Each structure stands twice: as C-alpha cells, then as structure tokens.
Regions:
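Flavin-dependent oxidoreductase catalytic cores
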Residues: 1-313
Length: 313
C-alpha cells in the first residue's frame, strides 16, 4: 500500500510515520521542475528526505521536457528515490500553465517529458495520471477519453509504473472513482499499475487489488489522521476498533515532536493544528479541544491539549 503525494501534507515527517506503519512507498509533495531550475525559495525544502522513510517518489510537475530533464538529472544521485511526473493535479493555477491534469490534453508532450526524465534520471520514472479531463461521473460520454492509450504511451516513453487516479479532472476529488478504468489500464500495460481513488480503508485497498488486478494500491486523504491504515493493510487484525484515545494522543505527540525537529516550534505548531483535527475526527468530546488547539500560542500549550486528548472517550 502506497502513500499518495499530498500538497501541504506529505512532508518528511508524514512519510516517516506512514513508513513506520507499513507503507511500501510514499511520495513528496508536488515539486516544481521550474522551481528547481530557478532555485525558487522553499523548493529545496520539499526535497528533504530521510533514509528512514524508505523508498520515496519525488513528484515533479511541469510541462516543459527540458525543465523536467533538468530536475531529473539533479535528483539522479539521490539514493532510494524515484521520479514521478504529475499528470493529474486538477488545481486551476497548475492547469492553466499546461501542467498537472492539463498534460492529458497533450499526450505527445507528456510522452516527451517522460522520455526526457528517463534519459537523465538513471532511475525509475513513473507517472500519476487521471482518466480524463472532462466528465462528472468519471466518464465523458460525448467525448470519451482514451485513458488506456495515454497510459500505453507513457509506458512506451519509458515509465516504469503508472499510477491511476480513477477520476477525471472535472471531478476533482468528488464523485465515485471509476475502478473499471484502473482494471482496463492494468490489463493493457506490462509495467505495474498503481490504483488510486475511493481507497478509504485497508478493506477498500484489498477490494481494489482484487477487482482491478492492479499491482499496488495508493491512498491519500484516508491517511490523514490515520497513519495506522497501512498497518491495517498489512495485518487485518490491526483494526481501528481497538485504537484508544491514548493511542491517538501518543501518535500526535510523536508527530508533533518530529515536526518540531524538522521545522522548528512555530512552523510545527501551525502545521500540527490541521493534523490534530484529522487525528481527532470522530472522537467524542474533541470539538472544544480542537477549538483550543487552533488558538494555541506555544508548543507547550499544544502538548497540553494533545495530552488532554488521551482522556477523551
């Protein structure tokens, strides 16, 4: 089971926690190929990767083959790292530049980007795609998208694996994922296919693997506040039903501690607020604590609230 790239979330700490729970692979947040070329502030920070994270995919976004090639070459000597090219991001500011899911509209250029990366990287290059640009229900009946053809083209261009988010760009993250498309792509390719979309639990992951024939299953949003999902994948007996408030509090303390080491108290404090909300989602009587966490002004104050969460039931 694989941790998806999550903008603003899948930093080194989150990847480490996922790995400790059993994730076989994780991805960085999206890294701009142009940002690497122009040395944009903050871009290098996204490439902080610790060996304890296990194998990590650096997810590049960009639509210019020469920029993708530059970024891939820059990463070639990084150990335990593969290169992934984002062809699925639906966000308008990315799409308007011809990047992310807009690359589905120019398959030939997408293939050139893969070829450029594969030539320079000296390591596996993968692609994360969607199953089309238009279509509210995962299918555009009037103008069906040839997602199998696109995936095949990526394989021919040198992709070592293809991750498929089984939604269109128009769907963003809503509506039902079209697992049938994952099955069709899995049937057509000789390289591994990673299925993604509507994997909300370890049981969903097992079902996707069985129903689609994909090689690996990727989850993203389901891991927010629940890094244990990877442990449940490896061991069906590791059910969340047996997880106590104390277990959740302990994980939050570790998460916050690692964030402080990586980013310093202030940045860690701001970042941990959203994670506290995810960790305590569905926990009875947690609403007031969440409100207090969102106004916490120091690391010690936040730790006090995290410890208090251990007493909730």
């Amino acid at each position: 089971m694989v941790l998806a790239p999550l903008a603003g979330i899948s930093d080194s700490v989150f990847r480490r926690l996922a790995r400790e729970q059993g994730a076989s692979l994780s991805y960085t947040e999206m890294v701009s190929a142009k940002g690497l070329y122009y040395k944009s502030p903050g871009t290098e920070d996204l490439l902080r990767i610790d060996e304890c994270e296990g194998p990590v995919g650096v997810q590049l976004f960009g639509s210019e083959p020469d920029m993708i090639a530059f970024a891939a070459e820059k990463l070639k000597d990084r150990p335990n790292v593969l290169i992934d090219i984002n062809m699925g991001c639906p966000v308008p500011k990315v799409v308007k530049n011809g990047e992310g899911s807009a690359m589905l509209l120019d398959p030939d250029n997408a293939a050139r980007c893969v070829e450029a990366a594969a030539e320079k990287a000296g390591k596996p290059v993968t692609v994360k795609m969607r199953i089309g640009f238009e279509g509210k229900d995962g299918v555009d009946a009037d103008h069906p998208y040839d997602y199998v053809g696109f995936a095949r083209l990526m394989e021919r261009a040198g992709a070592s694996a293809v991750a498929v988010h089984a939604r269109t760009r128009q769907q963003y993250y809503s509506g039902k994922a079209n697992w049938k498309a994952v099955a069709e792509i899995s049937d057509a390719l000789s390289v591994p296919v990673i299925g993604n979309g509507d994997v909300k639990s370890a049981d969903d992951a097992r079902r996707m693997l069985s129903e689609t024939g994909c090689s690996l299953v990727m989850t993203g949003r389901a891991a927010l506040g629940d890094p244990w999902i990877f442990a449940e994948w490896k061991d069906p007996k590791a059910s969340k039903k047996h997880r106590s408030a104390a277990d959740i509090s302990k994980m939050m303390l570790r998460h916050f501690g690692l964030l402080r080491e990586l980013k310093g108290d202030r940045t860690a404090l701001m970042g941990m607020r959203k994670h506290f909300g995810w960790y305590t989602k569905g926990v009875r009587k947690a609403a007031e604590l969440r409100r207090q966490v969102n106004t916490a002004q120091s690391a010690d104050e936040l730790i006090e609230y995290i410890n208090a969460a251990a007493e909730l039931s």
